[in-house]
């Protein structure tokens, strides 16, 4: 990761401000500026496992991946650089968490693309750290303020839930389909047969809805769930627990932390990373599935109909079929056979 995002390029216009600062980087860390910016000391906290992977190679223990930051993660920092995400409740969770730990008087810089809604940072932090806009470039805004009052933070207050048939789905800010079942997942679920058996892996599990519905009508299924997002991992664990289902849930960048083979891999793969369109995760899912499927095992994914996945499926497995579709979505199915490229 070498190219800087527009938000980082705006920060670099103010690099002199950070040379003697002890900086905590947090939020939507899309590049490795936290490892490369000239500071007195740098730490980073992220809820995204793939961002942690990149930064950990350069920052070691000075970057931490978790749902909630702790006091040790912000120790000795006198400056917060926060990259605004596209999701306002996610920003609220992260900023209230961080500012409840950081000392009064620290410098706060909030940066983000205008289309992300970064201007709402002013209203969100008005009670705790009044912000002023100090730069505008690359279609981004940069805001600065000082912490005048620590907020109280209760992670439990951010939990939500919704009912799906007889199931309870637990959610957190930043989790895909936080407010209800999305149309793509609904289409994929319509193709899953009752009494499915064997080992099933849900990649990009979100709130755990695919796995929970599958377990509800296939009690003998053995579930493994993974996601890059710490909120998604915790939400999936909570969803399984709320409905009395067992499953192994952990953070993974597609297959990076996955061991073993499965009888079925299911996914509603993301095609955005933050605000940016990215097909990398879905392509890595398709190409990597051959190393994690048993012979005769099945990959079943749902995707927007316009995305170019049929070619990757055919290149990797030798064939694919569309087993359900609407005007917007298609469910693709393929099987692990001898012609698959291992």
Curated annotation (Swiss-Prot):
Catalytic activity entry: guanosine(1207) in 16S rRNA + S-adenosyl-L-methionine = N(2)-methylguanosine(1207) in 16S rRNA + S-adenosyl-L-homocysteine + H(+)
Keyword Lyase belongs to the record: no
Q: Which GO terms label this protein's molecular function in UniProt?
A: 16S rRNA (guanine(1207)-N(2))-methyltransferase activity; nucleic acid binding
- The Enzyme Commission number assigned here is 2.1.1.172
Q: Which UniProt keywords apply?
A: Cytoplasm, Methyltransferase, rRNA processing, S-adenosyl-L-methionine, Transferase
From the Swiss-Prot or TrEMBL record, state where the protein is found. Cytoplasm
Q: Which residues form a coiled coil?
A: none
InterPro entries from the entry?
DNA_methylase_N6_adenine_CS, Mtase_sm_N, rRNA_ssu_MeTfrase_C, RsmC/RlmG, SAM-dependent_MTases_sf, Small_mtfrase_dom
Q: Which residues form the signal peptide?
A: none
Q: List the disulfide bonds.
A: none
UniProt enzyme class? transferase
GO-annotated cellular components: cytoplasm
Membrane spanning residue stretches: none
- Assembly with partners or alone: Monomer.
The entry sums up its family as follows: Belongs to the methyltransferase superfamily. RsmC family.
What task does this protein carry out? Specifically methylates the guanine in position 1207 of 16S rRNA in the 30S particle.
Name the chain's protein. Answer: Ribosomal RNA small subunit methyltransferase C
């Amino acid at each position: 990761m070498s190219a800087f995002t527009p938000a980082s390029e705006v920060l670099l216009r103010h690099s002199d401000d950070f040379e003697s600062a002890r900086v905590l980087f947090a939020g939507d860390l899309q590049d490795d500026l936290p490892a490369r910016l000239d500071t007195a000391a740098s730490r980073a906290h992220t809820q995204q496992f793939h961002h942690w992977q990149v930064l950990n190679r350069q920052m070691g223990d000075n970057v931490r991946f978790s749902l909630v930051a702790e006091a040790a993660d912000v120790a000795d920092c006198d400056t917060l650089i926060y990259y605004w995400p596209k999701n306002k409740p996610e920003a609220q969770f992260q900023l209230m968490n961080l500012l409840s730990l950081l000392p009064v008087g620290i410098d706060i810089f909030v940066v983000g693309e205008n289309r992300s809604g970064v201007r709402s940072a002013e209203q969100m932090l008005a009670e705790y750290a009044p912000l002023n806009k100090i730069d505008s470039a690359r279609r981004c805004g940069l805001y600065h303020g000082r912490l005048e009052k620590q907020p109280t933070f209760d992670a439990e207050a951010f939990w939500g839930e919704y009912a799906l048939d007889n199931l309870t789905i637990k959610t957190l800010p930043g989790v895909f389909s936080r407010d209800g079942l999305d149309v793509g997942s609904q289409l994929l679920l319509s193709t899953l047969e009752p009494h499915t058996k064997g080992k099933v892996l849900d990649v990009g599990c979100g709130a755990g809805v695919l796995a929970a519905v599958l377990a509800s009508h296939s009690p003998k299924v053995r579930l493994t769930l993974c996601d890059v997002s710490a909120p998604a991992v915790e939400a999936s664990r909570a969803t399984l627990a709320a409905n009395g289902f067992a499953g192994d849930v952990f953070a993974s960048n597609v297959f990076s932390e996955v061991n073993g083979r499965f009888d079925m891999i299911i996914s509603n793969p993301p095609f955005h990373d933050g605000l940016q369109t990215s097909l990398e995760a879905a392509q890595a899912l398709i190409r990597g599935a051959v190393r994690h499927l048993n012979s005769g095992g099945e990959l079943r994914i749902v995707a927007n109909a316009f995305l170019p996945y049929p070619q990757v499926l055919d290149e990797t497995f030798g064939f694919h079929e569309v087993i359900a579709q609407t005007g917007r979505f298609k469910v693709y199915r393929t099987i692990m056979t001898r012609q698959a490229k291992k």
